């Protein structure tokens, strides 16, 4: 249940009834401190200013017509005109009882939309590196959240599977085949193979001529080139899938929608943009001039969509991509989880898309940009030698470090269980360290912090779940055995319950903002509220009615943490 939305509607109605213009914002927010109630309506002062009336007097008028019977225990004016709302304990308890017996723990499904989410997007013939981590796991957390809310989500892995580099790769494949009769198709070999191909292309003119010829052949549908290209894609995606599976990322080969997928659309798009008068010839190239973007001379910036040699650009592909997602996938909303450095490029492509009428304004095109992963020196995360860190190497190191941690914490566990726990904690630590940071900011990657059992970390959250779940196990009862209702007698109980019932608000915030850190913040706060409750309120030793009430709170906490972590793509453990 979205309590914030419920109260916001009630306050909005009261504002209008008190004389505010229709549509005046109630601005209901969760209260920062318990002494200010559960929710606070902050819109009164702005409305009072427009009406030219005293904010506190107007706030009283709003309260006089505010219908929160049975929902709020008390409503009071604070400061210059804030309205503090204290929810009724019995009403909260009833909502918790409903959530306990609901598979969705009280979260309502939204009206279904078709939502395309573009994320991960590694390049073919190269191994995934740490630069791919943020797009992959942030995008996947949002995908899981949107699906949980009932939307039809299309995962779009826009891999880099096209371009002139394939000419040099195929030329080198042919050379090796001619010399040895076979070609290794392991991605680790391909990484070196790529560098070798580039060196040959730069230093051997005869090789470069052959490479350029292969580009033309590939674009013309040559059978041999198409076969070699497909092998390169297949080998790359097999290795990428290993990384996805290790990270518990929901992408599969079926979700690949690479650059090449839109090739057939590109000539038609250029022709259509010319016909619409949007594209004009400039120095032999086809260019769209955008008035909203100026060059250094103050003139409209030209965006090239076809080079003078007839070749197309990334912008042309992105125009086609947006058009396809609306026309063929019936998208209501398209989310791109792409590096912040691509922002202007995307905005220009989408400007052309809108001007051409390919995607109507009611369909949102959203760039959810993200910052960089930095080392402790504040520079882009690199190996000691200054090279790019392979994602697989990062995950391997995380497993080694987690294994040492689990061995120190629980040396008596059998080897198989320690290994399972270490792998689960390792992947969770890498993901949560990233997901818990604001998406748009850079963050420092720190092994010690991310594997700590204190603070807003994966090990802390996984342990919090294990601890809560173990209480219910020790009680040795099922939910059906708990016949006594939830009754709130302690402020720690109320603080926990109020936070538990804000889960839907956290889910909706992630879905709307594309910000998984909001879920991490919520779960960390929830774990803290449970810890305070557990210290202040005995559970198993309490008298039966109180014991059952508190066991229900513990169970709802465990279910909520588990569901929240699952939306982040993080697995829980029954013991650590």
Swiss-Prot record:
The keyword Nucleotide-binding applies. GO terms for biological process: arginyl-tRNA aminoacylation. It comes from the Bacteria. GO terms for molecular function: arginine-tRNA ligase activity; ATP binding. InterPro entries: aa-tRNA-synth_I_CS, Arg-tRNA-ligase, Arg-tRNA-synth_N, Arg-tRNA-synth_N_sf, ArgRS_core, DALR_anticod-bd, Rossmann-like_a/b/a_fold, tRNAsynth_Ia_anticodon-bd. The keyword ATP-binding applies. It is found in: Cytoplasm. Its EC number is 6.1.1.19. It is an enzyme of class 6 (ligase). PROSITE patterns: AA_TRNA_LIGASE_I. It catalyses: tRNA(Arg) + L-arginine + ATP = L-arginyl-tRNA(Arg) + AMP + diphosphate. One of its GO terms (cellular component) is cytoplasm. A motif ('HIGH' region) lies at residues 122-132. It holds the Pfam family Arg_tRNA_synt_N. Keywords: Aminoacyl-tRNA synthetase, ATP-binding, Cytoplasm, Ligase, Nucleotide-binding, Protein biosynthesis. Belongs to the class-I aminoacyl-tRNA synthetase family. Monomer. This is Arginine--tRNA ligase. The gene is argS.
